[in-house]
Amino acid sequence: MVVTVRAPATSANLGSGFDVFGVALSKPADVVRVERADTTTITVTGAGAQYVPTDPQENTAGVVAAALDAPATIHINKGVRPSSGLGSSAASAAAATVALAELYDRPLDDDALVRAAAQGEAAASGVAHADNVAPAILGGFTIVREDGIEHVDASLALAVCLPETTVSTRDARGVVPESAAMEAVVSTVESAATLTLGMCENDPQRVGRGVEDALVTPARARLMDGYEAASAAARDAGATGVTISGSGPGVVAVCRRRDRKRVAAALVDGFDSAGVAASAYQTRIGDGATRLAADGDDRAP
């Protein structure tokens, strides 16, 4: 028996929801194919495959297989570029979790699936955190709590930009303030509440206002040449809000569907004005991990 699952790219933090908020993107995605075996082996193809470890102890899908006691021959077709800030390792972990649970007939509930996938994330980041794997499994908008996951089946237009630069996760974590003035805390709580309401109502204006934060994004923006120019250009083109995706360097802009193409182009132009090459694409908040038909195409979209 072979099980094939597609799991999407994700954007975590969303400005005001540091380590808490996440959304699934309709594209790109990883596609993971699993088959029972005595020991786990991993092969990887697709975007940035050369940067993805195939040692099961170092690969997120391999760690998931060990956590579930579900050895398998695992093939990962990467659609989510590693080190993009779009949850590349989480996409593989999420797809592997859903696929292996199906392969071994393990009826796990959503929280258990997310917990298992988060263990895989520890192979990539050193921390079993769920802000990317939760939306990769459940889709829509998710809120990660210590005792569970809140989920909203949101659907909003987005533009995503990938500048040709790198941001170390260690550096991105290192610049996050350890303390903050009460005024900044109140402002961030206000934004987080506004964003959550906006997701519940599929309101791009509220979500756009809600991604603004006074704590994490300003600190991380200093690590990204061209971010301020790209953010300003996107807003001029109709974006209701712009923020760094995860620890970067990916950038996500909230917008109305009619403005999405123009916003994507503006993000590229903004980075270009600062001497940074970039590419961008149009997407939306989308579905989570999905099993593909047995004879389906396992190419990563």
UniProtKB/Swiss-Prot annotation:
Disulfide bonds: none annotated. The keyword Repeat does not apply. GO terms for molecular function: ATP binding; homoserine kinase activity. This is Homoserine kinase. The lineage of its organism: Archaea, Methanobacteriati, Methanobacteriota, Stenosarchaea group, Halobacteria. It comes from the Archaea. Signal peptide: none annotated. InterPro entries: GHMP_kinase_C_dom, GHMP_kinase_C_sf, GHMP_kinase_N_dom, Homoserine_kinase, Ribosomal_Su5_D2-typ_SF, Ribsml_uS5_D2-typ_fold_subgr. The gene is thrB. It is found in: Cytoplasm. The keyword Cytoplasm applies. Keywords: Amino-acid biosynthesis, ATP-binding, Cytoplasm, Kinase, Nucleotide-binding, Threonine biosynthesis, Transferase. Belongs to the GHMP kinase family. Homoserine kinase subfamily. It is an enzyme of class 2 (transferase). Pathway: Amino-acid biosynthesis; L-threonine biosynthesis; L-threonine from L-aspartate: step 4/5. Its EC number is 2.7.1.39. One of its GO terms (biological process) is threonine biosynthetic process. PANTHER family: HOMOSERINE KINASE, HOMOSERINE/4-DIPHOSPHOCYTIDYL-2-C-METHYL-D-ERYTHRITOL KINASE. It catalyses: L-homoserine + ATP = O-phospho-L-homoserine + ADP + H(+). Its main location: cytoplasm.
